[in-house]
Amino acid sequence: MLEYTAGLIRRNKKKFLISSGIIGVGYYVTKTINNKIQEFQNRIREENFAKEQIKRRFHQTQSDCYMTFLSLLPVLCEPIMDDLPVETITKQLQIRRLEKQIGNKDVKNSGSTVLSDDFSTSQEGAISEDTNKPPELKSKNQLWQELKIKAITRFLTLIYCESLLIVFLHLQLNILSRKSYLETAIRLASETQGIDLVDQESNGDFSGNTQDENLSEQAFLSFSWWLLNKGWLEIKNKIEPCVEQHFGGINPRQQLKINEFAELLNKCQNCIDLKVLNLTEEDIHLGVGVIEDQSQPVGRKSTNFITNALLPPKEFEFFLLQQTNDLDFLSRFNNNIVNTESLNMLLDELNNYLNNADINLIVNKLATLGITKVLDEIVLNLLQKNRPNPISDMNIRDIDLNDFPPYKLAALLANITKQSISLTNNSVENPILADLNNLPELNDLSASVYSNFDP
């Protein structure tokens, strides 16, 4: 039997060798293919996981942007409300009206809070003034003129400053979030796969301690101080002449239809867009703007107004850090030149974004949306008084405003004042602010910043 088997092998040796080779090659190929498939599946899972991580962190960053905006809103609004004291002027008009009604008897000791027909009790509680200091004596007409200009100026200043703050924070936090994610991903790849990768944004410097890196990021976040304390005044000074131009000649007792009032606000906005955003009506219609020369010299000086309103000149940067941080922070920050270099890189990138024409268009869309939402609320408030059935904001677009009677400008100013106060409400449930934060173009901007991994 053994001889027969040995003879069979000798006679078919070549066939056995070929068969064994085929089986061996087949096994190797099959194993290789299986390994490649396994690697491909693992890579797909890793990519999907990475995409989910990026998506999750992106959405978390947008939520952080909104919560940061709400936390800074009182800081932004307080000086604007103080600089444009509409309620104080209203108080003086109330006193004048009361003096006339009761024959100027014991008015100063009455402490009355009676309001005129044109201003509702919604303004109570917003007045903060020194009662021991007598108000400046002005005629009733002067007070009404001042009230008219300040009420509309304050409303538009709040809208534009809040729009700028939203954009500024979305740029800041998405730059930092992308930077943090990229550094984490590179560090993990280096540790788990032994790959020597260089993060071009940090010049491959992973030897510096995390604490120092956090110092530059903290300093970067401090730069919102400029808009909150300086920039808003620049915005207000651009807005007030536009309001004077289009509302200055209108008597507060003059009657206007709602669409006429909206048209006046639109003219003011066009004037503001030209002065603040350097946008004409044609630019807005075409969706284009003036692109700032981004090859800026050292110092980041810019002729773009909103950039100058949002970022300080180079020589004031350390002053800003002094205003926003304690001495211990400043000492630790200055001890390492890398902190200054890292901060400058972040500011340069932010400056480049702010000088892009798309930013001006987004600010315009935010302001337009805010003004539109406020006008919708005013329409609802006015129409609810004259209609027994409630009107929702869902069917307000079906209403023909030409069918409704005109209102005194004073009544419209009262509603503008009421809505201005609502713009200072930093509740998460504030519908107007939520709509601003959910503007699609703002989300697109955030996505483009977050996904920009170019050096």
UniProtKB/Swiss-Prot annotation:
InterPro entries: Peroxin-3. Its main location: membrane. GO terms for biological process: protein import into peroxisome membrane. Pfam families: Peroxin-3. The chain crosses the membrane at residues 155-171. Belongs to the peroxin-3 family. Component of the peroxisomal docking complex, composed of at least PEX3, PEX13, PEX14 and PEX17. Component of the peroxisomal translocation complex, composed of at least PEX3, PEX2, PEX10 and PEX12. Interacts with PEX19. Interacts with the pexophagy receptor ATG30. This is Peroxisomal membrane protein PEX3.
